């Protein structure tokens, strides 16, 4: 109750004050207009000065970057896409009108532009008006050469930086297909990023459907849903202008310009003055004042007592090892060793390789007629051809279905609050207004309150190890430590300075004199007095002996003690260096004459000498000769070809020339084969390897020259290139009685500015022209006629292809060999000796081949299938035995090994091809560990010595290991010893770069020539490896 009564006073005062404030406000509202003007004359003026701000000016510059390279300008019909761009851009800018956007910003538009190929031309500088820009746009002409998009972007950025001032919103519309032929200016990504740093917003628009989407995305700003969004100049499957692209880009431009220029400002209207406030309550007690100045410095303290002697220090660490002693004296010469035991017999050597042919023997007498032979086995399966190169991109597919409707736009900001108006009467429902413009994106909302706890989630997988955290904050101060031991007595301190004299206090008021009081009680003891030193007293009596003092510190080192007894014998030292050889002794007495030695090897015959010469020099091989022949290849190096297809053209030239035999060593001689090459693009870029080039005097030098040709990536001037080839190569260096062939490769139409009459520039009675057209366009009548014109109207000399990869097909290379060299001469040297085989083939001796396949996880499922096909191809290639006890021909077996207890015999030693192929189809991949030692032991025990007959008695036993050598070493030495006992001839096929050569050398019994290294399992099917492998095992 007391508290309530205490609060009634202040609450009553506040309540009364509030009522007075309301009355004062009502009184202010009741004042007449004249009085109001007299009371506050500045209110209306303030309102007039704080109306809505003026509409902001927003100048916008739009820059167009147009691609007129060959890949765009040469689309059928020529320059059709350029003409389309010249219609698209004016229609685009015609819809960019100066206006008040959303009644808040005043948009005004200016324009600029350039077009590019492998060079850049600015046709309209930034800031141009619509009329001058449109006039300049209609006057551009395409370059039809390479595509350097990065240089165009760099030039565009420089133009805008130089000609456009601050406060201008910059947009760029880049119309290109996204393909590039070079990046001499740093690349698209770098130049597009520099443009964005300058505040330029880039839109990427495709002129056709043959586009590189990734290149367009590299150009466009983020997000791509705004600046790329499948923009195109023409509608799908039509030549009409895509109006939807124009509308969407303009909508984004206006919205972005509005967001850049519009500045939100609050509407400020001053209100009337409020009522006078009430007197505040008495303030609370103030905080404690600042501490006073320090007092006078105290006197020096008494010296402390001397502390105890410290504890002994830790034991010292052992000293460093002494230096090595001097070399000892030379030891005595050792006694001669005992005689060694007899060595064990060496292992049986592997069969030798096929030797060179021996001397031809005398003709033998005719033998008896043989028995009629049985029907022959099916023929061998042909080699699998090499995988062709990837084809050109397919034609554009049908247009996709319309996309889903876009999401609703963001709601705009609320407008500024208006001034309160006069309350009107209730009106009727008005007509429905038009749909408003989409508002700009709203400001971020306030942070929401914490939501309710969700259900407990499942325990997540352990995440990856996070980065090292930042250094922790400095920890709080620790607790006060225990009191330390007394320190040693310190030196006497200096005398302190006298303190400053304090100020005198104010005198107090004199009070009335009081009566004498009663004696008070006894006071408290006074505070201790100051311990000033008194005068020295008289000496006291001698005291009693004190307690024993603390233990003293460690004393100084004593004198050196007497020497100790002799130590134990040390470890033996390293042997000293060998002594210098002594002087040469006197010459001994000649020994008795020895016994005759064993007969020597027979001397080398003439055939043996010739064999060594052929093996060492390789100069006795047969060679192919095509007679006096000149071949000129004319290859297309324009942008439309592409780098990959240009490489295929060069490979085609090299592969064909490989089939023509040796090249003339002297290009000026009247005989032999000479080869020239012309690569062409636009005018002035032709490059040639001439027929009479003295540097091209061998096949290897010609290959090197072809490989050094670089892709020009420009326009296509085919007629001028044919004229250049005839005048500069054929006409200038023609030889008498020499056949001349020309092979022309092109991908289609040439630049219309070139002269069509030059298509027949090679049509000479002594020149045979083969025209190779690659692409679908040659099915058209006009382009087919151009190809026939190049081939001098000879249809049999025209070759049509769909893909460039068909150039390097083996069948087509054979066809070109027959065209260029129809009647070759095979010239072999006359040898005095013929040869025969040292070792018979697999058809003339028994061979049992056991394949041991590493089925570990390093092999992989896909490579396992490739190995199965390899074993199957070997079974088809070899001549297999007719029965298990056949004394000739081969049998095969396959064992897949994994861990120590995982060995799988796919099929034992057999001659039946059907059994081999069915077993290979059933074989499964172990996907286990690798223990080659247990695999070898299992093969010997279960395949070589198997219950089903095992290896033949007099057959050569061959083990073929398919492994990388990364395996367990358990029982490896034992298994290698077992191979030696069984006279196994090993062969190792190691695939990949990660191999264990130590293990491979052991299982090959030390014969490194028996180890075949290949880069991948696809190489097992290549003829270069497969034929070599078959010759080795046979």
UniProtKB/Swiss-Prot annotation:
Task: Show the ranges annotated as biased composition (Basic and acidic residues).
Answer: 321-333, 380-392, 434-444
> Which body tissues produce this protein?
Highly expressed in adipose tissue, lung, adrenal glands and ovary. Lower levels in testis, tongue, skin, kidney, heart, intestine and spleen. No expression in skeletal muscle or liver.
Q: How is it modified after translation?
A: Prolines at the third position of the tripeptide repeating unit (G-X-Y) are hydroxylated in some or all of the chains.
Keywords (A to Z) from UniProt: Cell adhesion, Collagen, Extracellular matrix, Glycoprotein, Hydroxylation, Membrane, Phosphoprotein, Repeat, Secreted, Signal
Q: Where is this region: Triple-helical region?
A: 271-605
By its UniProt entry, which PROSITE patterns does this protein fall under? VWFA
User: Major location, coarse class?
Assistant: secreted
Q: Which InterPro entries would you find in this protein's record? A: Collagen (IPR008160), Collagen-VI/PIF (IPR052229), VWF_A (IPR002035), vWFA_dom_sf (IPR036465)
Q: Where is this motif: Cell attachment site?
A: 381-383, 441-443, 504-506, 513-515, 554-556
> Where does the UniProt entry place glycosylation sites?
155, 342, 645, 800, 912
| Chain intervals with Low complexity compositional bias | 302-320
Signal peptide limits: 1-25
Start and end residues of each VWFA domain: 61-249, 630-820, 848-1029
Locate the Phosphoserine modifications and list their residues.
720
Q: Tell me its family.
A: Belongs to the type VI collagen family.
Record protein name field: Collagen alpha-2(VI) chain
């Amino acid at each position: 109750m007391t508290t309530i009564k205490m609060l009634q006073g202040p609450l009553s005062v506040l309540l009364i004050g509030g009522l007075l404030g309301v009355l004062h406000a009502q009184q202010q509202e009741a004042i007449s207009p004249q009085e109001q003007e007299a009371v506050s004359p500045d209110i209306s003026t303030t309102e007039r000065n704080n109306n809505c701000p003026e509409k902001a000016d927003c100048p916008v510059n739009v820059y167009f970057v147009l691609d007129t390279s060959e890949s765009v300008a040469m689309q059928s019909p020529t320059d059709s896409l350029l003409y389309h761009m010249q219609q698209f851009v004016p229609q685009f800018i015609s819809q960019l009108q100066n206006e008040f956007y959303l009644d808040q910003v005043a948009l005004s538009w200016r324009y600029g532009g350039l077009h590019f190929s492998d060079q850049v031309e600015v046709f309209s500088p930034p800031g141009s008006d619509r009329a001058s820009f449109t006039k300049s746009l209609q006057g551009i002409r395409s370059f039809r050469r390479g595509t350097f998009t990065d240089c165009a972007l760099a030039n565009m950025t420089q133009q805008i930086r130089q000609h456009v001032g601050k406060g201008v919103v910059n947009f760029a519309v880049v119309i290109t297909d996204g393909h590039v032929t070079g990046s001499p200016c740093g690349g698209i990504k770098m130049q597009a990023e520099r443009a964005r740093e300058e505040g330029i917003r880039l839109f990427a628009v495709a002129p056709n459907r043959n586009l590189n989407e990734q290149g367009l995305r590299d150009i466009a700003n983020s997000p791509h849903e705004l600046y790329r969004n499948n923009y195109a100049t023409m509608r799908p499957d039509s030549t009409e202008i895509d109006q939807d692209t124009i509308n969407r880009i303009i909508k984004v431009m206006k919205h972005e310009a509005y967001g850049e220029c519009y500045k939100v400002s609050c509407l400020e209207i001053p209100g009337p003055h409020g009522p006078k406030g009430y007197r505040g309550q008495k303030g609370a007690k103030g905080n404690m004042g600042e501490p006073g100045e320090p007092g006078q410095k105290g006197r020096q303290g008494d010296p402390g007592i001397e502390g105890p002697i410290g504890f002994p220090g830790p034991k010292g660490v052992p000293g460093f090892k002494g230096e090595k002693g001097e070399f000892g004296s030379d030891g005595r010469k050792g006694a001669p060793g005992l005689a060694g035991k007899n060595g064990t017999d060496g292992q049986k050597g592997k069969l030798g390789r096929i030797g060179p042919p021996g001397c031809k023997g005398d003709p033998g007498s005719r033998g008896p007629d043989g028995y009629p032979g049985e029907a022959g086995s099916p023929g061998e399966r042909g080699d699998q051809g090499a995988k062709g190169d990837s084809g050109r991109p397919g034609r554009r597919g049908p247009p996709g279905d319309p996309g889903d409707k876009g999401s609703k736009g963001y709601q705009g900001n609320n407008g500024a609050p208006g001034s309160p108006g006069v309350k009107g009467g209730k009106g009727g429902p008005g007509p429905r207004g038009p749909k408003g413009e989409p508002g700009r994106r709203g400001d971020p909302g306030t942070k929401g309150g914490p939501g309710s706890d969700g259900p407990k989630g499942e325990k997540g997988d352990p995440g990856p190890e996070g980065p090292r955290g930042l250094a922790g904050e400095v920890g709080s101060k620790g607790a006060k430590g225990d009191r330390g031991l007394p320190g040693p007595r310190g030196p006497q301190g200096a005398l302190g300075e006298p303190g400053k004299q304090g100020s005198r206090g104010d005198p107090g008021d004199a009070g009335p004199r009081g009566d004498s009081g009663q004696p008070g009680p006894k006071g408290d003891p006074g505070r201790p007095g100051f311990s000033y030193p008194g005068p020295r007293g008289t000496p006291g009596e001698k005291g009693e002996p004190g307690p024993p003092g603390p233990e003293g510190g460690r004393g100084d080192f004593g004198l050196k003690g007497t020497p100790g007894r002799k130590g134990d014998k040390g470890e033996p030292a390293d042997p000293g260096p060998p002594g210098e050889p002594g002087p040469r002794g006197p010459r001994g007495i000649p020994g008795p004459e020895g016994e005759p030695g064993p007969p020597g090897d027979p001397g080398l015959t003439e055939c043996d000498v010739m064999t060594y010469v052929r093996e060492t020099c390789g100069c006795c091989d047969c060679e192919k000769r095509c007679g006096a022949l000149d071949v000129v290849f004319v290859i297309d190096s324009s942008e439309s070809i592409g780098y990959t297809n240009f490489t295929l053209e060069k490979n085609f030239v090299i592969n064909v020339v490989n089939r023509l035999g040796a090249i003339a060593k002297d290009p000026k001689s009247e005989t032999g084969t000479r080869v020239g090459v012309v690569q062409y693009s636009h005018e002035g870029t032709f490059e040639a390897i001439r027929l009479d080039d003295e540097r091209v005097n061998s096949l290897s030098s010609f290959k090197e020259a072809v490989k050094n040709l670089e892709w020009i990536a420009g326009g296509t001037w085919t007629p001028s290139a044919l004229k250049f080839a005839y005048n500069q190569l054929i006409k200038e260096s023609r030889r008498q009685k020499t056949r001349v062939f020309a092979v022309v490769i092109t991908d289609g139409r040439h630049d219309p500015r070139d002269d069509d009459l030059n298509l027949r520039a090679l049509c000479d009675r002594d020149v045979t022209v083969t025209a190779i057209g690659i692409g679908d366009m040659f099915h058209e009548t006009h382009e087919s006629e151009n190809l026939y014109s190049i081939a001098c109207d000879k249809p049999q000399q025209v070759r049509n292809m769909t893909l460039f990869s068909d150039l390097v097909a083996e069948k087509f290379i054979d066809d070109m060999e027959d065209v260029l060299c129809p009647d070759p001469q095979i010239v072999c040297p006359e040898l005095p000796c013929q040869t025969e085989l040292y070792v018979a083939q697999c058809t003339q001796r028994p061979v049992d081949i056991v394949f041991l396949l590493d089925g570990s996880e390093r092999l992989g499922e896909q490579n396992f299938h490739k190995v199965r096909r390899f074993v199957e191809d070997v079974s088809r290639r070899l001549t297999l035995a007719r029965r298990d006890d056949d004394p000739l021909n081969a049998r095969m077996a396959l064992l897949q090994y994994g861990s120590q207890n995982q060995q799988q015999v796919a099929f034992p030693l057999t001659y039946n091809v059907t059994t081999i192929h069915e077993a290979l189809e059933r074989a499964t991949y172990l996907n286990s560990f690798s223990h080659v030692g247990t695999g070898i032991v299992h093969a010997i025990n279960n395949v070589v010595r198997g219950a089903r007959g095992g290896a033949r008695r007099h057959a050569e036993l061959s083990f073929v290991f398919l492994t990388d050598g990364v395996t367990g070493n358990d029982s490896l030495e034992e298994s290698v010893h077992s191979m030696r006992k069984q006279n196994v001839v090993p062969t190792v096929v190691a695939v990949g770069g990660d191999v264990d050569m130590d293990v491979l050398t052991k299982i090959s019994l030390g014969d490194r020539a028996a180890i075949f290294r290949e880069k991948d399992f696809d190489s097992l099917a290549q003829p270069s490896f497969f034929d070599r492998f078959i010759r080795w095992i046979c």
